[in-house]
């Protein structure tokens, strides 16, 4: 199989390049990450990428695969058009090769305060929810912060320091929707400006690339609805 892989070391390279590799590997039963690790182990130890769990859980191996963001560890080689083009997630600074600087994503994630705010005295056991209340969080808590969604979003490319992005806004709604949280008004205040939320234009790139099948666009729409209702 043939692979065309993005190579760039900012400390030594004047500009990025695509490097071609050929690997004798059976597509059936193998994921893209399997091939990349074999290339690194057998052909070019300088190839740099992130990986950890290899099960689509940690989110560390997000990359752009034949023009679409995804996780290398759960992307089957079967069906990928050759040469398989592998690039870093777009819109983020490249540290080296397929490794990007996640700081812009992490800063926006932190800005929505992704933790429960509850002023009541802490109970001796966990704060309880009914099954119906917990069901409100389905499709929200499964996010693994891989960055595939925000790095597929043109609005996030345009100004990552102002627009929170799909990943951060999904997290924001996850806590707005949580019955145990008491900070809804402050959370909405935090998003009520022309950029942080309303730069989302609903093109749904985030939905099409999410490896967990989540819908950040729907969550963003619900936040917009809450803000509109609050202002009327």
Predicted feature residues:
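Eukaryote-biased recognition of intrinsically disordered, low-complexity regulatory segments
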Residues: 1-21
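Short, contiguous acidic and Ser/Thr-rich linear segments
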Residues: 19-30
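Short strand-turn-strand beta-turns centered on an Asx-Gly dipeptide
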Residues: 24, 65-67
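Ferredoxin-type iron-sulfur electron-transfer modules in oxidoreductases and energy-metabolism complexes
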Residues: 30-42, 87-232
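Active-site phosphate-binding and catalytic loops of NTP-dependent enzymes
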Residues: 44-50
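Short, structured protein-protein interaction patches enriched in aromatics and acidic/basic residues
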Residues: 53-62
């Amino acid at each position: 199989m043939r692979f065309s892989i993005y190579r760039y070391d900012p400390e030594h390279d004047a500009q990025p390049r695509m490097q071609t590799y050929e690997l004798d590997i059976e597509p059936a039963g193998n994921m893209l990450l399997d091939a990349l690790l074999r290339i690194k182990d057998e052909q070019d130890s300088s190839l740099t990428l992130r990986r950890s769990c290899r099960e689509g859980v940690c989110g560390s191996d997000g990359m752009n695969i034949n023009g679409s963001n995804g996780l290398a560890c759960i992307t089957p080689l079967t069906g990928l058009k050759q040469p398989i083009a592998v690039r870093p997630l777009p819109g983020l600074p490249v540290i080296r090769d397929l490794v990007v600087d996640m700081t812009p994503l992490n800063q926006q994630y932190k800005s929505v305060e992704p933790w429960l705010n509850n002023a009541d005295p802490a109970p001796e056991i966990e704060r309880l929810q009914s099954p119906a209340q917990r069901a409100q969080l389905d499709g929200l808590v499964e996010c693994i912060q891989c960055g595939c969604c925000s790095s597929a979003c043109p609005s996030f490319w345009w100004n990552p320091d102002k627009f929170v992005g799909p990943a951060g806004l999904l997290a924001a709604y996850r806590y707005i929707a949580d019955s145990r949280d008491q900070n809804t008004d402050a959370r909405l205040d935090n998003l009520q400006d022309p950029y942080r939320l309303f730069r989302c234009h609903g093109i749904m790139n985030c939905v099409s690339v999410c490896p967990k099948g989540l819908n950040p666009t729907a969550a963003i729409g619900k936040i917009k609805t809450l803000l509109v209702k609050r202002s009327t």
